[in-house]
Curated annotation (Swiss-Prot):
Domain of life: Bacteria
Pfam families: Arg_repressor (PF01316), Arg_repressor_C (PF02863)
Protein name (record): Arginine repressor
Biological role: Regulates arginine biosynthesis genes.
HAMAP family noted in UniProt: Arg_repressor
Family to which the UniProt record says this protein belongs: Belongs to the ArgR family.
Length: 156
């Protein structure tokens, strides 16, 4: 049990350091973690952590190349601000079309797919900012359309 707490502390410290956006090399991250009391940390472990958490090198405000973490997406839920990414929902006789903020369609489609057939969703196809979804057997297009409006708290 003590080991997992130590690991959690390491992950928390690692993420906090990367949020500072001032480390341009893995050795700088190793040194900073060692300064925080993680004596057993090495470059190889930092490299694995950078990969695991999807860290990327980008330019900070001072135009220096630094490591940083992408915005955390996690598993989407309907109570999260994802509903703010849905701009418009419409339908015809065959499909429901959902327009999202640029880049958000695949995330919203993932949420819809996770609800599955029991909620009336046969499947989704997502581009960058548009999603097509079709109802499962036993559900009408209009029923699914109304369920999606409720899900994302859109106006009926």
């Amino acid at each position: 049990m003590r080991n997992s707490t130590k690991q959690e502390d390491l992950v928390k410290a690692f993420k906090a350091l990367l949020k500072e956006e001032k480390f341009s090399s893995q050795s700088e991250i190793v040194q900073a973690l060692q300064d925080e009391g993680f004596e057993n940390i090495n470059q190889s472990k930092v490299s694995r952590m950078l990969t695991k958490f999807g860290a990327v090198r980008t330019r900070n405000a001072k135009m220096e190349m630094v490591y940083c973490l992408p915005a955390e997406l996690g598993v989407p839920t309907t109570s999260s601000p994802l509903k703010n990414l849905v701009l418009d929902v419409d339908y015809n006789d065959a499909v429901i079309v959902i327009h999202t903020s640029p880049g958000a369609a695949q995330l919203i489609a993932r949420l819809l797919d996770s609800l599955g057939k029991s909620e009336g969703i046969l499947g989704t196809i997502a581009g960058d900012d548009t999603i097509f979804t079709t109802p499962a057997r036993g559900f009408s297009v209009k029923q699914l359309y109304e369920a999606i409006l409720v899900l994302f708290e859109q106006e009926l």
